[in-house]
Amino acid sequence: MLSRRSFLNTSFGAGVALAAPAAQQAAAQTPAPRPARRIVDAQVHLWKANAPDRPWPPNTVPQLPQPFGYDQLLPMMDEAGAERVVIVPPSWEGDRIDYAMEAHAKHPTRFGIMGRIPLADPQSAALLPKWKEQPGMLGIRVSFNAEQTAWLRNGTADWFWPAAEKAGIPVMFLAPGNLPIFAGIAERHPRLALIIDHMGLSIDIAKAGEREEAVAQAAALAKYPNVSVKLSSAPTYSSEPYPYRDMTPFIRRLYDAFGPRRCYWGTDMTNSFAKATYRQRIAHFTEELAFLSEEDKDWIMGRAIVGRLGW
């Protein structure tokens, strides 16, 4: 039997000895595999049917003719590779959050909630100190559509901003066309996390050809560190099929203004249900936006919203 010294003195042994350091060096230079990207959807509406035992407010219209529940959503998430979803209870159900809480109770690792409150009632301030003690509750979403827009100007909503700031509650807000008002709110309440919904866009704004102006309003709020933006519902506001190239300049403008750590991907899928599959909505950002680095995608596709909401 050859000793180690005798083995190394052979030509074969010398080759092995020389190859070993080279193999070790090559292994050291091989980059470690990237960790799996977390896909966290910053907005989906879930709702139950309008029924006598669970009535909706009058004259409200859902985004789909049939209810859309978590049992329908979960297989879509699994097929597309989405880890979590932020449930935003829809306005047509009023201010109730019971179905969102049911979804979280049954699937606590998959669903978080941005709840709703009766914003026009100042007594709702009593709900805020313990708001986030509710299971799955991440923050509050407020909407300013149609007649609710006046609440931003007539003092109706004034009580809410300092109360939410004091309670440490992140706020998502839908106020298309009215974003300049939030410059003052952001400045007066620097510890209040404010999240712009849907890039500042709406269907009416898109139809009117005013997307550029609305996105500019959103970008102007990037100067405030406590403001961030959901790059959500892109198919809804596009006039083109997948991959929605007409939306790229708007997404790029907000990415440049806010940076990837203050931008959040989201589907808002029921608002444009027939325009894209769940997988396409993910691939739009992970495969079709060439200006995003892999690290940018990690932040925008999930890491940033999880951090902002403390999830």
Spell out what each predicted region is.
Residues 95-110, 247-256, 281-288:
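Short, electropositive alpha-helical surface patch
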Residues 2-21, 30-42, 62-84, 252-253, ...:
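Mid-to-C-terminal alpha-helical segments outside catalytic/metal-binding sites
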Residues 74, 101-102, 129, 183, ...:
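Active-site phosphate/pyrophosphate- and oxyanion-stabilizing loops and adjacent acidic/basic residues
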Residues 138, 151-264:
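Catalytic pocket-lining loop regions of alpha/beta-barrel enzymes
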Residues 268:
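Active-site glycine-centered loops adjacent to acidic/histidine catalytic or metal-binding residues
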Residues 83-84, 93-177, 184, 228-234, ...:
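Active-site gating/metal-coordination segments in enzymes
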Residues 47-67, 205-207:
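Acidic/histidine-rich helix-loop elements
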